[in-house]
């Protein structure tokens, strides 16, 4: 990557007029890292060099969303260049899993009880649910109905309205699983019922 960037820089020094195409997809597809950060840095490098066109692909699951990411990154890079500032505090960003500021939390007081996981399982007499993601929707299947939605709340609210759950522990389980599915849907991650989401080094 570094040697290719050097060649781009040298060419631009020789010829400042001919439009240049930057194949960002060649980088995002060939490294097992989240595309959003790679697209951000590559767009900034391209802007500094004077590249005119950015090209990317969404050929694999790990690069889904790259077109949108690179579009935002190019806006950030151009705005930073015009303002003569680093690409931050611009009114738009590519922060997804991290945030710039930390909200201070209230320190707990009074009687504090350490939470403990219960291994007890009692099946809900109203039946079980199967949950999965299909075509950018969360599917929640019960013997009496299949509920489809994009958020945990709209599905849970429908489950309650249809009176499909009778136990508090089952309702709590359903809420946890549906929220996992919603997060997976937003981040374009795999979702498997009863399995933790894979956050790599952030386990």
Question: Where do the model's predicted regions map?
Answer:
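Weak global preference for isoleucine
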Residues: 5, 14, 31, 36-41, ...
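A general structural signal for short secondary-structure boundary/capping elements
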Residues: 66-70, 101-105, 176-179
């Amino acid at each position: 990557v570094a040697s290719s960037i050097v060649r781009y820089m040298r060419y631009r020094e020789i010829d400042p007029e001919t439009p240049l195409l930057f194949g960002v997809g060649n980088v995002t597809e060939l490294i097992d890292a989240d595309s959003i950060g790679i697209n951000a840095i590559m767009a900034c490098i391209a802007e500094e060099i004077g590249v005119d066109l950015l090209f990317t692909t969404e050929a694999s699951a790990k690069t889904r969303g790259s077109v949108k990411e690179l579009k935002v990154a190019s806006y950030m890079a151009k705005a930073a260049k015009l303002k003569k500032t680093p690409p931050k505090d611009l009114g738009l960003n590519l922060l997804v899993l991290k945030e710039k500021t930390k909200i201070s939390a209230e320190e707990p007081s009074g009687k504090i009880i350490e939470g403990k996981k219960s291994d007890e399982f009692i099946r809900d007499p109203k039946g079980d649910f199967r949950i999965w993601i299909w075509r950018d929707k969360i599917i929640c299947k019960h013997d009496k109905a299949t509920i489809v939605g994009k958020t945990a709340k709209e599905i849970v609210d429908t489950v309650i309205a249809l009176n499909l759950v009778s136990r508090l522990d089952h309702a709590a389980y359903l809420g946890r699983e549906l929220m996992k599915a919603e997060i997976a849907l937003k981040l374009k991650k795999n979702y498997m019922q009863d399995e933790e989401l894979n956050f790599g080094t952030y386990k």
